[in-house]
Each structure stands twice: as C-alpha cells, then as structure tokens.
Amino acid sequence: MAHTFRGCSLAFMFIITWLLIKAKIDACKRGDVTVKPSHVILLGSTVNITCSLKPRQGCFHYSRRNKLILYKFDRRINFHHGHSLNSQVTGLPLGTTLFVCKLACINSDEIQICGAEIFVGVAPEQPQNLSCIQKGEQGTVACTWERGRDTHLYTEYTLQLSGPKNLTWQKQCKDIYCDYLDFGINLTPESPESNFTAKVTAVNSLGSSSSLPSTFTFLDIVRPLPPWDIRIKFQKASVSRCTLYWRDEGLVLLNRLRYRPSNSRLWNMVNVTKAKGRHDLLDLKPFTEYEFQISSKLHLYKGSWSDWSESLRAQTPEEEPTGMLDVWYMKRHIDYSRQQISLFWKNLSVSEARGKILHYQVTLQELTGGKAMTQNITGHTSWTTVIPRTGNWAVAVSAANSKGSSLPTRINIMNLCEAGLLAPRQVSANSEGMDNILVTWQPPRKDPSAVQEYVVEWRELHPGGDTQVPLNWLRSRPYNVSALISENIKSYICYEIRVYALSGDQGGCSSILGNSKHKAPLSGPHINAITEEKGSILISWNSIPVQEQMGCLLHYRIYWKERDSNSQPQLCEIPYRVSQNSHPINSLQPRVTYVLWMTALTAAGESSHGNEREFCLQGKANWMAFVAPSICIAIIMVGIFSTHYFQQKVFVLLAALRPQWCSREIPDPANSTCAKKYPIAEEKTQLPLDRLLIDWPTPEDPEPLVISEVLHQVTPVFRHPPCSNWPQREKGIQGHQASEKDMMHSASSPPPPRALQAESRQLVDLYKVLESRGSDPKPENPACPWTVLPAGDLPTHDGYLPSNIDDLPSHEAPLADSLEELEPQHISLSVFPSSSLHPLTFSCGDKLTLDQLKMRCDSLML
C-alpha cells in the first residue's frame, strides 16, 4: 500500500513538471526576444532588444504582411513589417521592466510572440556602523549594520567573525533587506581582554562591497540583563529613611537609578558603583507616589548599559502637614442679637498636606474674654456656627493627618463691607473664553496704598440665597486691578462676584453679576398669584430654574392686555433683583378682565412668555372721581335752594307729595250740635273783619272752655307743614300769637309771607264766633262785639269745631275766595297708606280743654 502511494506521488510530480516546461516552451513557440548586453544592467545603461519570428510562423507566409510590435508593459514603443524587429532602449528606471513582442495580421487579433524582463539596479554600497552585542553573560553574539541605499537587485550578505586562535564564524543572509545576523555563539568571560573582529560583505550581479572590520573584546559587546526583583523599604515609616533593593548579574559593576513622581515627566538620575543591589534615597517627598527604574553595566568605561528594568511604583509615608490653610468667611445677620458665621477653606496641596487629611480643627474665640468658646472637628472644608453680634471674634483653622497638624490660620471676624471708602470702584465682569471670566476694578477712593490685598469671591447665583452653594475665591496683590477666574466656572451659569479690599481690620466691597457664556432664557417666570390691593394688583411669580436662565438675568417684563383684544399688550419692565418675586401694577381699569404673562431677559435676548393668568379688578373705582362731582353738585343745589322763589316752588311740590293721612281735615265745628242750635247768635255777631282785627282785646287768663272729646281715632301727626305767625296789625293780637309762633319755628322754617297772611286770615274767620272766656262777659271788655253764651246754654252732647267757611256771613265771602286762590290744589300723589296708622293716644282723660288743644290749618297738635 505504501509503495503504491509513493509511486502515484512521483507520477503526479512528473506530470506537473512536464506541464510547466511545456508552458514555458509554448510561450515563445512563434519567435524569440533577445536582450543585449544582459538582462541585468546598471542604472543609466542602454539595451538592444530583438524580436524575430520562427520559420512558417508569420501571416500567410508573406513576410510583408507580418507586423511585429514591441510593447513596454502595455505601451507600444516600436513596430516593423517583416520577420524581425530591432529596438534600442535607454533611460530605464530602477527595478524590473517587462517588454513583450506581438504579431499583427490583417483581419485578426494581435498574437503574442515572446517577452523579456530587464532588471535595472546598482552595485551594493559599503555596509556602515557594524556593531556586535551579546545580551547577558549567557547570551549569543549578534551583529547589525547599515546597508546603505537599496540596490533593487538580489543581494547576498555574508557576516564573518574572527577570534583568537584563528577561530572564524561565518553567517549568510540572502534577504534583499538584510541588516541583522545572529551567530548563535556565546562569548565567555574567560578571556575578557581577548580581541574579536567582525566584517560584513554585500554581493549582487553588478558588484560587491565589504564593511570596515570591527574589533572588540568580551567586555565591549556583553550587555547585562536588566535588574529584576526591585523593591523599596521605609524604615520606621519615615520618608527620610528609604532603601531601594534589586538583583543583578554577577559581573555588574555600575548601576544607575532614575525615579520621578507618577504625575511628572522629569526623571531624577542617580549613578552608583558597586551597589550590590541596594541604595538609599534621601530626597523623596512624603505621601507621594513614585516610579523607580534601574540599569546595569559591567565596566566603568567599556561596554553598554543594560535596558531599564520594569517600573516599580510605591507611595512614600506621610509626614506632618506644612503650610497654612487659605480661609475665607461669610457673615449673615439672623436677628438683633445673633449672627451666622460660615467659614470656608481650600484643601492643602499634596506637597503641603504630606499625607491624607483626616480632619480640620476649628477654634472660635472671643477676643475680649480671651478664652476659647468653640472647638470643632470636621472633615469638610466648611463650617457654620451662630454667635452673638456683640464682641470681637477670631477664628483659627488647621488641618491634621496621621502624623500631626498644620499651623493654624487665624482671621478676625469683621464686617467686610463696612468701610465704604475702601470699596473698589467700577467693577466689571466680562467673558474671557468658554469657562473664564475677567474681573476688573479700580482702586478705592481712599488712599490705594492702604489696601493690603484684594479678594475676589464668586459663587453660583441662586434666587433663595442658599448658603450651601460652594464658594470660590482668590487673593490678589494690592497693585493688581484685575483677576481671571476659571475655577468652577460653567457656561450659561450666572455668578455673583464680589471684590473686597482689605486694610487691617477694615474692608470694603463691591459686587456684580457675570457669566462666561449666555443666551436667551429657555422659559419665562411662572405667575403663581395675583391679588388686589387698594385699587392696584400685586403679581407674584416663581423664579426661573437656574438651569433655564442661561446666564445672568437683566430684567423682568410683565405684559397685560384686555381679554379677546387684538391690540398690542402693555408692558412693565422691572430691573432684576435676586430676592424679588412680586411687583405691583396700578394702571388696570376696574371691572375689565385682563390677560397677564411674564418674560425674562439676558444680554442675549428675551425668553418665551410664561404662563398666562386672567384677572379682573373688582375693587371700588377711584373715590375721588365720585367725591369731586358730588361736592360740586351739592354746592350748586345749596345755591339754588337758597333763593326765595325756588323755596316756594319746592314747598308747593312737597305739599302735593304729602301723604294722604297727613292732610286729613280737622272736624268742622259748624257741623256740631251747638252750631246748629244757635245759628241766630252766630249771625248776630257779624262784625266787619277790619273791626275784628283792630279792636280785639288781649285776653287775660280766660276760663277754660270744656269741650267733650269726639275724636275717637285721631291720626298721628308725622309732618308739620309750616304755618305763619298772626299778622301784627294790632297790639292785642301779638300776645296771643307768641306761643304759637315759637311752636311754628320749632317745626320748620317759616313759609313765604303771602301764604302766612292768607292762613292767618283763615284762622281768624274759623274762630271768630267762639269765646274762650267764662259764661259772663267781663266788665273790662265792654267793646267786645262777640255774643256771649252762658256756660249752661252750651250743648252737653258732642259737637265739632267749625271748619267750613261757607257758613260765614256773605260779606266775608271775598276773603275766602282770595284764600282759596292762594292755596295749592290738592294732588294725591302720596305713596303712604292712610288707614293703617295707629290711633293717637291722649293723656288728658275724658275732657279736652282748649288750653290743651292748639289748632292749625293743617294739623292738630297737643
């Protein structure tokens, strides 16, 4: 089975070889291409190329119809009609160039005849910088060199090493790019001073070249292996006692060390001789991570350094902190007796902390008493406490690690903005790039030389004034008037910036708002309430979230317009203040529904409007608008009512509007039994009116006339229209009218004189037949024309007082007619009921005397 398989394999290989030979032969079966002087030429040489057809391989056996074409790669460079073609070619480039000869017949495709490759190159240059090295005591010798320029031809390199006792080692390399060869032999330190010679030779078709011989000894070419097993040890956990350990080969005489902090690019170098694998380092920093590397060498002057060892990373021990904390503070009044102190400080640098800071110690002291009031331990970089507003206070802050504490930083608590003359002037904040703000100011008005330092403070602006917002600050020398702040600066965030000028125990400050980048706010304020206050409205709103403000706000705008109105809205622009969240508006009209909304503005533009709220002012209109016209109307009415003519017309109108129950007539005495029984007596007593008015004596204490009460239901008097006094033509009537005149003035103002005269005459006629005396006439009144009736003759039954003037004598009718003309015609316009009044209750018993009864033309009065 094995013999069969082996035979098949040999047969397969034979077939493949025959096919390749056949293909080679068939490639040029129609002709040949020859190149002279050679297929390999030197750069810049000329070659002759000949293409010839074999017998009977042309076109139809006619040579004139044979067209031979010569191609250089795919480009035609020459052609000829016949059996052969000769062409001379120059200027060939470095490398390989392919030429192909083809036959072209009429009405047929071109037929390939044969081809040839021409190799253009240069002779090898002399190899340079030949060097040999043996890595470690147990390594092998290897050499490197520089080839020079590329020959573009097949080149063979031969490396030869000769040693003592005619020892020779040789190694070849047939790679065109060969520049390294390893002999694979090891030189031993038995003869460290023995010389060895190395040489390399390059050979190709155009020539050869050899390097200069390189002579060296064992110590020259042996490179030690890098040190290994590196470690470090700190004695008593002290950075001042640090020892580095490593391991080396036995023949190493010299070492070099390099080390650096892990965050640094610069190395510290140390050379040590006969270190024997250890070295003490004295300049390391506490609590710092270092990177260590070591290299070795066999001889001080001969040989080469080993490669650097692998890095060792280690952290040094802690030490007591150095430096002092940078402390700043804020003060805020709580009430009349207390204040809040917030302390802030920056972390120490790594070189100052010299370890991990475990905590900070804060000591608050009242300077007057001199004793420590508060001591606190905190792990944060801020601390807040409440102290009295009285007294002088100082604070000290120090940092502590596992080895100790730093020196305390002491500051006196004072009012940083108390001295107005120390306040920096013309403070400005401008954007300086993406995350930087340039703050500039002018020295205070007070002597600038008094300023010891400036402090620039900044923090994110929060509407609520949150004291938990991180505080940032930097200190500047007194001759500086600008500062570039970049720590914790973000785009589209507004910062409250303060510049303090400090001088001893005094300070002055100025503030401004600034941002590194801004654009229009993303939203407007949200109106949460609208209230009415004394004819105006108070609008309250929620502040825009900080992340939507997109920079420092400059103004708020309040817009309003009438609901369902297409007119342009009115607006009110309010300068932005951090603590403001309400604003009054007093230009709205009452009982009109308005739509209100708000926007906010930055230096980049205006935000979209916030929510809309409707509101209608329901309060009273402006009272001055009603008081002023009312006063004017009252003055005009008083002026009108003060005229006599208008008063008379008004009284007539009031009499017409008087209720019906107020104008009920008094019972007429003419209808009484007494008047009907003695009509003759009444007629006999007729006297002229003029005589009655002239000769009427003044009564002196008349006896009361007893009259039975016949008014079972008397209407109460609610209104007393004015009646006039009696006319004063005679002295006898003046005394009788005195009491009645007083009563009339107490009821109302006197009516016009004409009405008084008419009324007086009417009353005289009504009572002309009655005598208010006793039964017998007195002798002192002999001239009295009245008829005297005895008391016994008076009727004992009920009677009525006369009120009908129609029964009077005829000679007095004209007087009655004239009185009727003066009285206004009765018009019943009253809206008051006349039948629902309660009876008038008299307190005079069963009898009503005339001294208790006073009768007027329009009312009955007791």
From Swiss-Prot:
In terms of PROSITE patterns, this protein maps to: FN3, HEMATOPO_REC_L_F2
Result of altering residue 802 to A: No effect on in vitro STAT4 binding to a phosphorylated Y-800 peptide
Carbohydrate attachment residues: 48, 129, 166, 195, 271, 347, 376, 480
Which stretches are Cytoplasmic in the membrane topology? 644-862
Keyword Signal listed? The answer is yes
Compartment(s) = Membrane
On induction, the UniProt comment says:
In vitro, up-regulated by IFN-alpha.
Modified positions (Phosphotyrosine) are 800
Compositionally biased intervals (Basic and acidic residues):
728-744
Q: Where is this region: Required for STAT4 binding?
A: 796-801
Annotated protein name in UniProt = Interleukin-12 receptor subunit beta-2
The scientific name of the source species is Homo sapiens (Human)
Q: What is the lineage of its organism?
A: Eukaryota, Metazoa, Chordata, Craniata, Vertebrata
As recorded in Swiss-Prot or TrEMBL, the protein's gene is named IL12RB2
